[in-house]
Every structure is written in structure tokens, then in C-alpha cells.
UniProtKB/Swiss-Prot annotation:
Topology class, membrane: Single-pass type I membrane protein
Designated name of the protein: Immunoglobulin superfamily member 6
Compartment(s) of residence: Membrane
PROSITE patterns for this protein: IG_LIKE (PS50835)
Record field: compositional bias (Basic and acidic residues): 222-241
Region ranges (Disordered): 214-241
GO cellular component terms attached to this protein's record: plasma membrane
Gene3D superfamilies for this protein: Immunoglobulins
Single GO biological process annotation from the record: immune response
SMART domains hit by this protein: IGv
Gene: IGSF6
Tissues expressing this chain: Expressed in peripheral blood lymphocytes, spleen and lymph node, with low levels in thymus, bone marrow and fetal liver. No expression in non-immune tissues.
Further comment found in the protein's record: This gene is localized to a locus associated with inflammatory bowel disease. It is coded entirely within the intron of METTL9 which is transcribed in the opposite strand of the DNA.
Length: 241
């Protein structure tokens, strides 16, 4: 029994040693998150970029926090001396027990617009997963004053109400125009019908007049022809011996 137990313990220790050598046991893994976008105007005296991290299987020692900035010029390493004073351009605050750090940009100007990256590392751990950076926060400093959220919400609601009002006015105008155009259209149709009837009546009267005139002329010509024929007949009878 003792020999079997000792053998199992030795096998377990060998397995742990192998796993530790390949990094399966005690592997330190970090993940870092930070806001991807921040926008302020020149009236802000300072802006703070927050960074949170989570560590799994890492040593109990406190990690190191680093900040980088990528702007229009060369990338910069920020706050290598700590940046603990608010009189500095940048101020770093660390709450490592709560897994939180932050970078404050003081006396904000448009030149501070850049991408700020938070980095967390356990220097004693050689693995790459023990040194991670966030996705970066794009800071945009506007040279014009931005509207507050309350004012933007109010303006959005006002624009929506105006859109509804304008739509209602347009619909009412269209309906009113249609209602006014219908009587005029009916009147025009009626007048056109009366004009057509009047024209038809005039044409009929003209046709009747022409027919009557032609009929009278035909009768007169017929009577004239008959008289001529009778005169010729009488003359013929008179000339016979």
C-alpha cells in the first residue's frame, strides 16, 4: 500500500513538472480593456481615460502600468517617471487592487488629440500573455464648444416634433387642395359639357338650315324645269301645221 501510494505521488509530481515546463500550470494571462472613443472640447480643463484589467494565474505581486500615445508624430512613452502630480501634463492614478488605472490629460488642447494605449505587465513573468495592452482610446479635442447631452437630447426631440408638425401641415394642405380642386373640376367638366351641347345644337341648326335651303333650291329648280318643259311643249304644238 505504501509503495503504491508513493508511486502515485511521484507520478503526480512528474505530471505537474511536465505541465509547468510547457506552461499549462501557473500560466499568467492578462486582459486589458479601455474605452475606444472620447470626445471633448477646449473648455475642458482635463480629461481622464480609464483602464481596467483582469489577471488569471499571475503572481501576487503588483503589475506595472504603462501608457503610450500615438499621434501625428512619433509614438510616445508617457509618464515614465510616474506622473503623480497634477501640475504635470499627465497624471497617472493606480488602484491595482481593484484592477483599475487611469490617465488624466491636464490642460487639454487640440494637440492632445491622439490614440492613448494602456499597458499592463508582470515583469517577473516571461510569458507574452503576462504583458498586454488595451485596444486604445481615441481622444478627440474639438476647437468648438460641444453641446451637452441634455441640450442635444432636447434639440433632437424638438427636431422630431417639428418634423411631425411639418408632415401634418403638408398632409392637411394636400387634402385641402384636393377638396378645393374637386368642385372646380366638376364645374369645368359641367361647363365643357354645356359647351359641347351648345356646339352640337349650333351644328344641328346649321345643318337643318342648309338642308332646308338646299331643299327649297331643289324644289325651285324642279318647278323651273317643269315650266320650261311645258313651254317647249306648247310651243311645239303651236308650230305644227
Amino acid at each position: 500500500m505504501g509503495t503504491a501510494s508513493r508511486s502515485n505521488i511521484a507520478r503526480h509530481l512528474q505530471t505537474n513538472l511536465i505541465l509547468f515546463c510547457v506552461g499549462a500550470v501557473g500560466a499568467c494571462t492578462l486582459s486589458v480593456t479601455q474605452p475606444w472613443y472620447l470626445e471633448v472640447d477646449y473648455t475642458h480643463e482635463a480629461v481622464t481615460i480609464k483602464c481596467t484589467f483582469s489577471a488569471t494565474g499571475c503572481p501576487s505581486e503588483q503589475p506595472t502600468c504603462l501608457w503610450f500615445r500615438y499621434g501625428a508624430h512619433q509614438p510616445e512613452n508617457l509618464c515614465l517617471d510616474g506622473c503623480k502630480s497634477e501640475a504635470d501634463k499627465f497624471t497617472v492614478r493606480e488602484a491595482l487592487k481593484e484592477n483599475q488605472v487611469s490617465l488624466t490629460v491636464n490642460r487639454v488642447t487640440s494637440n492632445d488629440s491622439a490614440i492613448y494605449i494602456c499597458g499592463i505587465a508582470f515583469p517577473s513573468v516571461p510569458e507574452a500573455r503576462a504583458k498586454q495592452t488595451g485596444g486604445g482610446t481615441t481622444l478627440v479635442v474639438r476647437e468648438i464648444k460641444l453641446l451637452s447631452k441634455e441640450l442635444r437630447s432636447f434639440l433632437t426631440a424638438l427636431v422630431s416634433l417639428l418634423s411631425v408638425y411639418v408632415t401634418g401641415v403638408c398632409v392637411a394642405f394636400i387634402l385641402l387642395s384636393k377638396s378645393k380642386s374637386n368642385p372646380l373640376r366638376n364645374k369645368e367638366i359641367k361647363e365643357d359639357s354645356q359647351k359641347k351641347k351648345s356646339a352640337r345644337r349650333i351644328f344641328q341648326e346649321i345643318a337643318q338650315e342648309l338642308y332646308h335651303k338646299r331643299h327649297v333650291e331643289t324644289n325651285q329648280q324642279s318647278e323651273k324645269d317643269n315650266n320650261t318643259y311645258e313651254n317647249r311643249r306648247v310651243l311645239s304644238n303651236y308650230e305644227r301645221p
